[in-house]
Amino acid sequence: MMSEPKRLHPVAVILNLCHTIIQTIKNIILPFFFVYIVNSNHTVRFYGAIALGVLFIWLVAASIIKWRRFTYRIEDDEFRIEEGLFVTKKRYISIDRIQTMNTSAGLVQQIFKLVKLQIETAGGGKEAEAVLSAISVEEAERIKEAVFKKKAQRRENELDEERLEAEEELDPSVEVQEHYRMNAKELLMAASTSGGIGVIISAVFALISQLDEVLPMDWLFDKFSFLQHASIGIYAVLIFIGLFIAWIFSIAGMMFRYANFQIIKKEQELVISRGIIEKHQVTIPLRKIQAIKIKENIIRQLFGFVTVSIVSAGGGDREKEEGALTILFPMIHKKKLPHMLRTFTPEYTLEENCRRLPRRALKRYLFRSVIFSLFLIIPLCIFFQPWGYLSVILLPIELLFGYLAYKEAAWTINGDRLQLTSRFIGRTTAIVLKKRMQVCKFSQSYFQKKGRLYTISTSVKSSSHMEELTVRDVGEEDAAFILKWYSYEKADG
């Protein structure tokens, strides 16, 4: 009976303990540990060891108490959770507010054949409303079935279409319509061009800065003091080796993250799964999709590959590597993209023939590309001669990016579908349906008014905020056409 209070699997004690230890290490233990190791006073070491032992025992006891006091049940059309170490906290989540329930399995869960269930609600923000960290696969399916059944019962008096959708969610025998699995070439391309090298380098510098505060680093500097007299060539080689190692680590991380990536389309929903060490699975109803975003960085564009994301209202992948987005295709060739969108998101198809910006918008793109750099370049050229003149190299590079941004900015309308393309460093194409647009804004600055240009932006609802899609400096006549298209729908509505 789902109305009876239930506890998590005892493995939740291990998960709670690991999480608490990691948080404690971040906040307390790391500096204490290094001070304890460096300090040669035996009395300090003795009491330090006792303190560590007492703290560990307390963390184990707290994890067991938390597990014992955590219960969940479904009662009176609510998902009820009671938890707390000393004070009992009660959370009642209305079944109507539950949008999606996603499962994932880390290394510990996989060993014991368990899953983590995340319950997400409308307007729940970036974090899941409730998390059951260790339950059996069968229990997760029972919870999903019970929730979907209650939602279906409460919607019996609504439109037939909504009732059918609820029945499809409930029906476990729905046949798989389409299936896609990312191949090895796409996985390698996604990993090697992900830009994760920046994250690795930032993490290394952050770690070094933390170690420098608690450990004397003079001995390390002494060992590498010979580099003070090294040539520029040696420095260049060392920097290259460091960047190459960071790049290899970023590739490995991305390959573990997106290995076994696959999409299964079942009637009116997409089931997306990925991962080796930690497996993730999310379910997105097609009716929750608000927009599709197609992104290309410079390297991927050269090879003809793109990344496709979904903006959804509720649900999605909570890791937020793309902000409020869920990855639909981590890496796919542009030639395959139109067919794949028609297959998995038939309402959101890609248009090849788009309307470009007028010629008079070019100077605005070129001006915006260099204006902020000029405030840096001019002082460098004046006060840091002659090396400051090297900063002038930035100008042609930025002008090139400004020209590309102008050249690739575009829009098109096909029926009730609006497609916007813009570029900053990488190129982004957004596809949105008229009925999903929360607002459509047409703004015009003083200088845009002189050039008869407008900035067009529209917002769609995502799980945590409003996602804005924008194209700058659209011609006045084009802006009027888009406004008429959007206003016509509102008048009909």
Swiss-Prot record:
Q: What is its main location?
A: membrane
State a GO cellular component annotated for this protein: plasma membrane
* InterPro entries for this protein: UCP026631, YdbS-like_PH
Keyword hit for Membrane: yes
Query: How is this protein positioned relative to the membrane?
Result: Multi-pass membrane protein
Report the SS bond pairs: none
Please tell me whether the keyword Cytoplasm is annotated for this protein.
no
Per its UniProt record, what Pfam families does this chain match? bPH_2
Which PANTHER family did the record assign? UPF0699 TRANSMEMBRANE PROTEIN YDBS, UPF0699 TRANSMEMBRANE PROTEIN YDBT
Protein name from the UniProt record: UPF0699 transmembrane protein YdbT
